[in-house]
Structures are given as structure tokens and as C-alpha cells.
């Protein structure tokens, strides 16, 4: 009997890797439904190959005459609200949320409250709304398996260890494309340079985040909410080879390391099959192929956004929500060539400084904080606060 999967964000890098896994295991899984934001050509290709029950184009301004309302047996839905309809479908058993940004929140909550198993790759949902999402996960006893390579690695390690023996969890980071540049050189990084990553093929926003290690900061906050580990016991190391994806340090001084070829098919396959083991290798890669492995601590002068993430996480309340929203707004300005790469963390810092930290209890309150933080970034830009410093 095949397991029905709903894939949100099918046209992105995680979505494409998920489709690779589904192709490798046609007897085990079938694509029940999927979404794209606005890539209609990609949507047509996926529909033709997998013939799912539903297809959602989340961009409400998309030209509806291109795909219409039905292709073969596939119903075509439009708008962000339709994402929730997909995951609530009774036949859906597993939901993979690979949508970038806080837009992934409502479909993630819909999956949690509908009793679906959740493979979460949308880190912004936990970063922005962590306490609220965790309370819903506990209430509905939802099984959540992280899809990000680092969190999936830590998930597998922690599942196999006695939690009382754990001293610290460590996320690895490639260091991005600019790890060898001086701090002075970073000020002149171009958009074209920032959209290149040495290891992973990702979308523009995540690539920019990764090159400034703000992405790793988001992952630190996500790890806190996923695993319940205090920030003082979460570490980050730069590991350029991207072979080791997660490290668990034990109280006795020993460490366990999860290592694999840097390919998203490994964590995705694990999240789909869990708690059963993945039945066959998708890509052979042994220790003799690793070569030299290097690890070192990140320089927070080079990566100030990482330090800000730890500060926001420790502050708690709405601070992570403000951090994420300010970053998304600042990255958007950078991609429009309106601010420098090195100004992104400055906008985050000033937004955190200008906004009070609250402790909301409702989704609407969190969303209002998110909205105000984005508006604050634009106000800072208009007032030339950052560039004046």
C-alpha cells in the first residue's frame, strides 16, 4: 500500500529533491498533491509526470488561463488559502512543507491540526511562531520529522542516544561563498556573488541567508524549538566540506557525528520512511571518499547575523519573529540592489532595537508583530538610519 504525500513548494530545491525520492520509491509513495508559487511551466511538468489529485498555484495573481481549473484528473487551485485545503485532504498522510518564508505557517498548522505526519523544511514557521506551533504539536500529538539536513542529522542522532547523556548539539555550516573574504571585502559583495553557494543549490533568499550565516542563525532557533535544547547548549561550527551535518557532544567527552554526501535526498528519504529505515541506498558514499574534513568556530565579526540570532533566541517572546521578518525584508531590499550585503544584519539589529519584545498567545498577534517588523525595516530605509551610521 502506497503512502500519499502532499508536497508544498515543489518547484524549489527541496521540492525537486523530494520528487527525486518519490521517483526512486514508486511502490512506497505517491504524490497526492503539490504546490508551486508562480512557476506554471514547472507545475505543468510535475502534473504530467505524477498526475496528482490536486495542484495549487499559491500566487493569487497568476494567469489562471494557463493551467485552467483542471488538467486531466488533477484539480487546479489558486491562492495561499488553497495550501491549507491540500493538506487537509483526508487521503493525505504525509505533508512536506518546503515553502520558503512565513507564508508556510498556515498550511503547517493545518497539517498539524489535521493529524498529518509532517516533514518540515520551512524553518521560518518554527522560528517565527515556535511557542505557538509547539503547543499545537503537543496538543494534537503530531509526528514532526525535520527535513533540513542539519536538523534531520541531529534528529537521527538524538533518537539513538540517551538524552540524559547529551551535553551539546552542534550544527555545521559551510561558511558560504565569502568565508575567505576579509570583513572589509564583504562590504563590496554584489548580488550576483551572493546568489552563488559553494555546496547547495538553493533559491535566492536562502542562498543570501546562507552566505551571511543568517540561515544558520535561523536554524539555531529552529533547533531550540525542535529539540528543546537551551541556546547555551547549541553550537555552530564551520565545516567547508559539508560532509558532517550534525554533531552531538556527550557529557563523557565523546561525540557522535552524522555524515553523508551533501544531497537533500538523504534527509528527505528519512523523513518519508520514518520510523522505518530507508530500504536501499540512494547514493553510495563511504568514509574513504570523505577526504580532509575541517572544522572551526565562526567569526561573529564576519557573521554578525549569527550572533544576533542567538541574542534573539535567548530573548524569547517575539524577538525571533522580529529577527526573521526583519531579515526577510532586508534580503528583499538587497535583492533589489537597494542596500549592501553587509547592511542586512544592521537592519535586523535596528528593528530588534526599535520594537518591544512581547509574549503573544495567538497567531494573529504574532502575525501583527511580523507585519510591523517588515514595515520597520522599510521605515529605517526611508529614514536612512543604517546608511547614516
Swiss-Prot record:
Its EC number is 1.1.1.267. The keyword Cell inner membrane does not apply. Pfam families: DXP_redisom_C, DXP_reductoisom, DXPR_C. GO terms for biological process: isopentenyl diphosphate biosynthetic process, methylerythritol 4-phosphate pathway involved in terpenoid biosynthetic process. Keywords: Isoprene biosynthesis, Manganese, Metal-binding, NADP, Oxidoreductase. Mn(2+) binds at residues 148, 150, 219. One of its GO terms (molecular function) is NADPH binding. It comes from the Bacteria. Its cofactor is Mg(2+); Mn(2+). Gene3D superfamilies: 1.10.1740.10, NAD(P)-binding Rossmann-like Domain (3.40.50.720). InterPro entries: DXP_reductoisomerase, DXP_reductoisomerase_C, DXP_reductoisomerase_N, DXPR_C, DXPR_C_sf, NAD(P)-bd_dom_sf. Disulfide bonds: none annotated. Catalyzes the NADPH-dependent rearrangement and reduction of 1-deoxy-D-xylulose-5-phosphate (DXP) to 2-C-methyl-D-erythritol 4-phosphate (MEP). HAMAP family: DXP_reductoisom. PANTHER family: 1-DEOXY-D-XYLULOSE 5-PHOSPHATE REDUCTOISOMERASE, 1-DEOXY-D-XYLULOSE 5-PHOSPHATE REDUCTOISOMERASE, CHLOROPLASTIC. This is 1-deoxy-D-xylulose 5-phosphate reductoisomerase. It comes from Leptospira borgpetersenii serovar Hardjo-bovis (strain JB197). The lineage of its organism: Bacteria, Pseudomonadati, Spirochaetota, Spirochaetia, Leptospirales.
Amino acid at each position: 500500500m502506497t503512502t500519499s504525500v502532499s508536497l508544498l513548494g515543489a518547484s524549489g530545491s527541496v521540492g525537486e529533491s523530494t520528487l527525486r525520492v518519490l521517483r526512486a520509491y514508486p511502490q512506497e509513495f505517491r504524490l497526492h498533491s503539490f504546490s508551486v508559487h508562480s512557476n506554471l511551466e514547472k507545475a505543468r511538468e510535475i502534473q504530467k509526470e505524477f498526475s496528482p489529485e490536486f495542484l495549487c498555484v499559491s500566487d493569487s495573481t497568476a494567469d489562471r488561463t494557463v493551467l485552467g481549473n483542471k488538467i486531466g484528473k488533477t484539480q487546479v487551485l489558486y491562492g495561499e488559502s488553497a495550501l491549507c485545503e491540500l493538506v487537509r485532504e483526508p487521503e493525505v498522510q504525509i505533508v512536506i512543507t518546503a515553502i520558503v518564508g512565513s507564508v508556510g505557517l498556515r498550511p503547517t498548522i493545518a497539517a498539524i491540526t489535521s493529524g498529518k505526519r509532517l516533514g518540515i523544511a520551512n524553518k521560518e514557521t518554527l522560528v517565527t511562531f515556535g511557542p505557538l506551533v509547539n503547543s499545537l504539536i503537543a496538543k494534537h500529538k503530531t509526528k514532526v520529522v525535520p527535513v533540513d539536513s542539519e536538523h534531520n542529522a541531529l534528529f537521527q542522532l538524538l533518537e539513538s542516544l540517551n538524552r540524559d547523556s547529551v551535553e551539546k548539539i552542534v550544527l555545521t555550516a559551510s561558511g558560504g561563498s565569502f568565508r575567505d573574504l576579509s570583513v572589509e571585502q564583504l562590504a563590496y559583495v554584489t548580488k550576483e556573488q551572493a546568489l552563488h553557494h559553494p555546496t547547495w543549490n538553493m533559491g535566492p533568499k536562502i542562498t543570501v541567508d546562507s552566505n551571511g550565516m543568517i540561515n544558520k542563525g535561523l536554524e539555531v532557533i529552529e533547533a531550540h524549538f525542535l529539540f528543546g535544547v537551551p541556546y547555551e547548549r547549541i553550537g555552530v561550527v564551520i565545516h567547508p566540506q559539508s560532509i558532517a551535518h550534525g554533531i552531538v557532544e556527550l557529557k563523557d567527552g565523546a561525540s557522535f557525528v552524522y555524515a553523508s554526501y551533501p544531497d537533500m535526498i538523504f534527509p528527505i528519504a528519512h523523513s518519508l520512511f520514518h520510523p522505518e529505515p530507508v530500504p536501499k541506498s540512494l547514493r553510495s558514499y563511504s568514509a574513504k571518499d570523505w577526504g580532509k574534513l575541517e572544522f572551526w568556530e565562526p567569526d561573529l565579526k564576519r557573521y554578525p547575523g549569527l550572533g544576533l540570532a542567538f541574542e534573539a533566541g535567548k530573548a524569547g517572546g517575539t524577538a525571533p519573529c522580529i529577527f526573521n521578518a526583519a531579515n526577510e525584508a532586508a534580503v528583499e531590499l538587497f535583492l533589489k540592489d537597494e542596500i549592501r550585503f553587509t547592511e542586512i544584519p544592521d537592519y535586523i539589529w535596528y528593528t530588534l532595537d526599535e520594537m518591544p519584545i512581547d509574549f503573544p498567545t495567538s497567531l494573529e498577534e504574532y502575525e501583527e508583530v511580523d507585519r510591523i517588523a517588515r514595515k520597520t525595516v522599510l521605515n529605517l530605509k526611508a529614514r536612512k538610519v543604517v546608511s547614516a551610521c
